[in-house]
């Protein structure tokens, strides 16, 4: 804050009072270029700096207009006003070198200059001949200005600019100089885009994103180009509403067709460029190399993963092998210990048995009678076979530490216990056999008249027939019954129901019954073939080479080899059976021939049984 200095010594302070007139109101009108600029900014809601840029732009346009040089159109005076639609409006106004880039100010200035130069009144004053009305060429200047001053009509004329090059380069033209050929073509066609920021074609150093943006833009090109200027009919000339509608319909169809052709032209241009673009080829090769690298990396990763898995699997197998070996070693050691214990026990039992025999022998088997002594010897052997080690030891201790009478009593007591045990076991076995027989009778009770009389021969024949005609054979049980009726020696006729019932009962047989049936079959075999009596005193026998009969049953593998050999060596083959025998290891020529005959008989029997069943079924029908 600024303060005045105090008064000097000896000086006083003087106070002055002045009288002023009253304030008056006056109205002022704002004028001047500054006020004009302020009003413009306020109306446009723009700042002073923006307005300054606009002013500079207007000044630059004015300077361009001043610098614009019009080109004289030499054919202007020869133009036909009636054919104004086919004239070049830009050339008529002297803007042929500027064309679609000309501004409205330039068009207006060009028209003004052409009017000042070619107006009929001025030419008339100069003594030039003037045509009457619209027949004068000045009408062409007027029409040109009408077309170019109207934005809609100007766009229609620009769409069909006669100087525009609509050609599309071919693939062969751009094979070696792609960018030199296609760059100017895309630049001149970019004038038809509704979007202002048109991407450039670029060069070989352009990135994949830039190239992708470029082709995406042109494949989805949005063109403003339209062909209303080429309408053959003008709807203003129509005499009625229907005629005007018809003209509009025809014009729309023609415009749509021309628009379609234009879009096909653009699409052909883009397709040709894309197919010739060296960058696309480069990108494809890079993408292919990238995929190959990814594929190799993936395969390498997979290989490493498989190697790791295989390594882990081998480690697990090795661990399992070691564990198994350890377990087997433990089992082997345990088995060895058990075997040793068993051997020790066997030796002990053998020792006790021998001790029992010696003790009994010492006492002359407690009898002086030869028959009783032999019987006692049998009973002692029975004790040796049936008694456990502890019982044998206890019995031997008793025999060695007592008198003959006490030992005999102890031995007889032990023999009585063993015999009682054997008797009980035999009774239990007989009871099981009786129960099994009852069950068999119950299960086969409803099998028909023939089910009650089944001999061992019929049972064996049934088993053979069941094996001969396996499951899957047509009318299997009828065929089996027919086979049994043909080959049975009992004369009993069996039905399919009888055969099914007996087959089921055989399947349910107790194991003891099966053994009994097999034993009976073996007894019958011995009875039929006889048994060679054995000499009481066996002497070493001499071996004589003679025919050897092999009763070993044929295995599945031998059967397959035989069938294959029969197919390989037909009937007319020399030494056929010798070659067949060589193809079947372990079988002689005689074995192969015998097996072949058996197979033939089985097939014949099977066919005969099936045919008989088939004939019976036909007879029933």
Swiss-Prot record:
Record-linked CDD domains: DnaJ (cd06257), SANT (cd00167), zuotin_NTD (cd23953)
Name used for this protein in its record: DnaJ homolog subfamily C member 2
Region (ZRF1-UBD): 160-250
One GO cellular component term noted in the UniProt record for this chain: cytosol
Name of one Pfam family that matches: RAC_head
Misc: Constitutes a myeloid leukemia-associated antigen and might be a target for leukemia T-cell therapy.
Domain remarks: The ZRF1-UBD region specifically recognizes and binds H2AK119ub. The ZRF1-UBD region is also involved in protein-protein interactions with other proteins, suggesting that it may be masked by some regulator, thereby preventing its association with H2AK119ub.
Region (Disordered): 294-315, 426-453
Organism name: Homo sapiens
Positions where Phosphoserine occurs in the chain: 47, 49, 60, 63
Biological-process GO terms, alphabetical: 'de novo' cotranslational protein folding; DNA replication; negative regulation of DNA biosynthetic process; positive regulation of DNA-templated transcription; regulation of cellular response to heat; regulation of translational fidelity
Main location: nucleus
Record note on quaternary structure: Component of ribosome-associated complex (RAC), a heterodimer composed of Hsp70/DnaK-type chaperone HSPA14 and Hsp40/DnaJ-type chaperone DNAJC2. Interacts (via ZRF1-UBD region) with ID1.
């Amino acid at each position: 804050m600024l303060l005045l200095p105090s008064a000097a010594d000896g000086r006083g302070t003087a106070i002055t009072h002045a009288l002023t007139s009253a304030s008056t109101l006056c109205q002022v009108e704002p004028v001047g270029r500054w006020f004009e600029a302020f009003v413009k900014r306020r109306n446009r809601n723009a700042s002073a700096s923006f307005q300054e840029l606009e002013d500079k732009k207007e000044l630059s346009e004015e300077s361009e207009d001043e610098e614009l040089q019009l080109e004289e159109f030499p054919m202007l005076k020869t133009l036909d006003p009636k054919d104004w639609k086919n004239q070049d409006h830009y050339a008529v106004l002297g803007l042929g070198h500027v064309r679609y880039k000309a501004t409205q100010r330039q068009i207006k200035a060009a028209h003004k200059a052409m009017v000042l130069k070619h107006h009929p009144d001025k030419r008339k004053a100069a003594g030039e001949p003037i045509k009457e009305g619209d027949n004068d060429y000045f009408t062409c200047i007027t029409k040109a200005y009408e077309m170019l001053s109207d934005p809609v009509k100007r766009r229609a004329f620009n769409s069909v600019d006669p100087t525009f090059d609509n050609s599309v380069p071919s693939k062969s033209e751009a094979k070696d100089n792609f960018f030199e050929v296609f760059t100017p073509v895309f630049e001149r066609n970019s004038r038809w885009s509704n979007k202002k920021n048109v991407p450039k074609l670029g060069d070989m150093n352009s990135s994949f994103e830039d190239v992708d943006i470029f082709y995406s833009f042109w494949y989805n090109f949005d063109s403003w180009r339209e062909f209303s200027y080429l309408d053959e009919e003008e709807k203003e000339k129509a005499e009625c509403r229907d005629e005007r509608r018809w003209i509009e319909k025809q014009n729309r169809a023609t415009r749509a067709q021309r628009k379609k052709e234009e879009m096909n032209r653009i699409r052909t241009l883009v397709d040709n460029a894309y197919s010739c673009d060296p960058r696309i080829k480069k990108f494809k090769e890079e993408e292919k190399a990238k995929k190959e690298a990814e594929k190799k990396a993936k395969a390498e990763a997979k290989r490493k993963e498989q190697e790791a898995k295989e390594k882990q699997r081998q480690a697990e197998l090795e661990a399992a092998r070691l564990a198994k070996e350890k377990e087997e070693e433990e089992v082997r050691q345990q088995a060895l210990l058990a075997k040793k214990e068993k051997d020790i026990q066997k030796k002990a039992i053998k020792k006790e048995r021998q001790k029992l025999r010696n003790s009994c022998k010492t006492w002359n088997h407690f009898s002086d009678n030869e028959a009783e002594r032999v019987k006692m010897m049998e009973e002692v052997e029975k004790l040796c076979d049936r008694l456990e080690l502890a019982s044998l030891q206890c019995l031997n201790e008793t025999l060695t530490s007592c008198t003959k009478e006490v030992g005999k009593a102890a031995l007889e007591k032990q023999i009585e216990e063993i015999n009682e045990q054997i008797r009980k076991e035999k009774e239990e076995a007989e009871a099981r056999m009786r129960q099994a027989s009852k069950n068999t009778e119950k299960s086969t009770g409803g099998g028909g008249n023939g089910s009650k009389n089944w001999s061992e021969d019929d049972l064996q024949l049934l088993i053979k027939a069941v094996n001969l005609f396996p499951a899957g054979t047509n009318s299997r049980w009828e065929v089996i019954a027919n086979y049994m009726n043909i080959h049975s020696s009992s004369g009993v006729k069996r039905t399919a129901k009888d055969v099914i019932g007996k087959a089921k009962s055989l399947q349910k047989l107790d194991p003891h019954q099966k053994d009994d049936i097999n034993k009976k079959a073996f007894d019958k075999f011995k009875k039929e073939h006889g048994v060679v009596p054995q000499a009481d005193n066996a002497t070493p026998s001499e071996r004589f080479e003679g025919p050897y009969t092999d009763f070993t049953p044929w295995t599945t593998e031998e059967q397959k080899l035989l069938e294959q050999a029969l197919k390989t060596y037909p009937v007319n083959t020399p030494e056929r059976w010798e070659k067949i025998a060589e193809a079947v290891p372990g079988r002689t020529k005689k074995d192969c021939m015998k097996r072949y005959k058996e197979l033939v008989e089985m097939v014949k029997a099977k066919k005969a049984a099936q045919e008989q069943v088939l004939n019976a079924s036909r007879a029933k029908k």
